[in-house]
């Protein structure tokens, strides 16, 4: 379902063989040993990783700034923030540099950048998407989709969602979001 679509992946998600710093200067040379479940599902569905996106150090801020990358700017107005901690994804989508993006949310880290950047983000309920091995693995962190439209977020969420054999917290059965709403007038 994602064949050939450009995907922006938040830097906290590891991809085997590629750098993943979680926005931290001490981790700037870290190379992923495994690919997170979310990224793996997107790749298996045909998405093409187009960008790695900025995040504040260890995804712990409502705006994106690090000693590693500096300040991430909102493409609609460079004096404004794209929010955080998935602000790099929000800015990438708002600039039109990718069609889809990954984020994660504890206290607004998908919702804040979506609002600041004029894109759509969805924090799924805990257990809908497998956690994998992101840095701040805990019960409050929910990986989720971001895109420029509700339809694209639903499409990406349907790819991300579902049980995973290595995450016992994933909810069964898989819940699928409808991609068409014919009964709504």
Question: Positions of the model-derived regions?
Answer:
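Structural signature of FAD isoalloxazine-binding scaffolds in flavoprotein oxidoreductases
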Residues: 111-116
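Residues forming well-ordered secondary-structure scaffolds
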Residues: 33-37, 87, 117, 148-151, ...
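A short helix-breaking turn/cap at a secondary-structure junction
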Residues: 120-185
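Gly/Ser-rich catalytic/binding loops embedded in alpha/beta enzyme cores
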Residues: 1-106
